[in-house]
Amino acid sequence: MRMRFKPYARPELLACDFHVHEPLTHAGHWHELYARPKQPLHLELGCGKGGFLSQLAPLHPDINYLGIDITDKVLILAKRKVEAAYAAAQLPPDNVKIASLDIERLSGVFSPADTVQRIYINFSNPWSKNAGSNKHRLTHPRQLLQYRALMPEGSEIYFKTDDDDLFRDSLGYFPAAGCEITWQTFDLHKNEPDWNLRTEHEGMFSEQGIPIKALIARKGPDSSVTWVEPKELARRLEPEGGADAAGGVQG
């Protein structure tokens, strides 16, 4: 079900101290937006209504967090949830930011200087209706290569999903993008790790009897990347001289 337009969302976000109003202007300087810029930076890609971010960020004031989603009508809900969580913890929200961004264009908003130590991807769109849409998955190699550019070797990506096909495909995506899977489970709640924070979606799927799949992947050296963009692969496979060299000019 599509979420209705919320006319109050943008004005309320613009009045929020931890909302990044012009995210396109901060490439190379994201750390400077925080009260303690030398702290590690962790991203949640597709933060949705903020159920995960609002739990995690107040627990770790020694880490800076950025929650990203594409629309204000979703982000406004995250803003309110984060505010309530910090108020309950009696803490200032000075280690958390939220921003409206298209994650598929992340490389145009961040630079390698914006060192990201960890990324969380929780219950993202599986894009499973047809094979051509798979490239939009947040765990597809073309996306993972964007994240790699921001992350030092050894940094980690935490991924959770209810979708079987997305998870199985992701088990191939991560290694192809040079990310070693160091831990995985097809039933997160069977032996739930202490670090897991259940989101609204997670609770809903669990109540329906749908197992939650999860993994942790660690960025390896650039030499471990095996995936090649299809257009680039075609270029590499084309004989020297192009089509003329392959079979001559017809006609």
Report each predicted region and the residues it spans.
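SAM/dcSAM-binding transferase cores
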Residues: M1-K38, I181-G251
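Short alpha-helix immediately C-terminal to the canonical SAM-binding loop
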Residues: L75-L77, F167
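Conserved SAM/SAH-binding beta-strand->alpha-helix loop
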Residues: T71
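Class I SAM-dependent methyltransferase "Motif I" SAM/SAH-binding loop
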Residues: G46-G50
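S-adenosyl-L-methionine
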Residues: R80-A113
